[in-house]
Amino acid sequence: MIYSILKRDGREVVFDIEKIAAAVEKAMQSISYYDHLSDEEQENYHSYVRIMAELDWPAYLNGDTVFHQRVISRYEADGAPGVESAIYDYYGALYLKELEDQLSSSDVINKERLPLFHEALLLYQLGYYHGAVAILITQIIGITADIEKFLEKNNSSYDPETLELIKKRYGFDRKNDTARVMTAVVEGMSIDDDENEYGFLLGYLRFKLFHTHMPKEETEKHVNRHMVCHGTQLNYGTKEHALKVILCIDALAWVAEVISKNLAE
């Protein structure tokens, strides 16, 4: 099923929701807590992903069907402000504690990163968003490197088909940081976005977080790793900026868990 989304900046994005949903289902099954969705829940999930894609929130991996319905209801009633309110309510203190626990228990992520995650999440809760972003933005590639080292330690490597897809479709080699992150995601989720290049998480990482440049109007809502690390983006001190980076960290931690589970099978 191909969806067309008109984003807030006027751009049209076309993507195949069934391929994304199938990839998420396969990944969730591999970590053994996925309950098969009913037809109604599946349709709600499709609607949820469309809303997240339209509003540029990298939260589409969320598997909570109650939250899906809440987002849909808020969107229908209040549009983007309603959705953003629901997001901030949902991704609160309990979520942050669960995320920190997940990071701490990972057999993939380097334990020396844990104090950084703890401090960044604490800064976020205290409202020091510049500090939270500055710490976490450096850890995206860090988690990716941990995944690579984990595979190497276990005498494994990325599937050659994954590497070929990244090289052929996107023109990247794995020395490129963007390609390294995308390779990890594709490996973990078995995404083959043949119908669209904008599979949501891949698109967000590629065009927002890791793009070499971002227009000023985009920087008002998104963090760009290159611009932050080179000191050219200074306006990333908002709750929205920080939570979007946290969600990217969460997604990569989830991918790391999937890869670990797959390797153990």
Predicted region positions:
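Short amphipathic alpha-helical segments and their helix-coil junctions
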Residues: 1-5, 110-125, 224, 228-231
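Helix-boundary capping/turn motifs
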Residues: 16, 91, 108-116, 219-223
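Amphipathic, oligomerization/interface secondary-structure segments
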Residues: 130-134, 138-265
